[in-house]
Structure formats: C-alpha cells, structure tokens
Amino acid sequence: MRKLTDDELQFIIGRVMTYALEAAEEAREQPYSDFKDGRALAFYEALDTIRNELLARDCDLKFFGLDCSLERVLSPRK
C-alpha cells in the first residue's frame, strides 16, 4: 500500500472542509433541525480530530487549510 502525499492529504482535507462549510450553512438556514445540526457537528468533529493529529505531528496547519477557528467557521449558529 502506498502512502498519501501531503498534497493528496491537503486535497482530501479541503474537500471535507468544503462539505463541512456547506453543512454549517444548511444548519443555519434550517435552525433547530436535529439532522442538519448533527451533520454539521459530525464534520466539525472529523476536522477537529484531523487538526489535532496534525498538531501532534508538528504539521503546518496553514498548508492543510486548518489554521482557523473551526468552532467559529463551522458553527451552525452565527
């Protein structure tokens, strides 16, 4: 099995972030929808875990697009 390159991982994380932003926006548009809130939270949890693992490995969060406050960016409530 081959290992992912940093560029491939960056691409994958970027796609997940795009879906997460869409999920957060949908949750804002339909407040108090348990499904929409749960979907947004699931993306947040996944990206937060990835971010923490990258931090633990001293990776450049900016390169991977995770140098932001995920809580602020992905909150279903503004």
Region annotations inferred by a language model:
Residues 1-37:
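N-terminal acidic leader/helix
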Residues 11, 66-78:
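Long, non-catalytic architectural segments outside compact domain cores
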Residues 14, 18, 41-48, 75:
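Generic structural signal for well-ordered, non-transmembrane alpha-helical segments
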Residues 34-70:
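Short, charge-rich amphipathic interface segments used for partner binding and complex assembly
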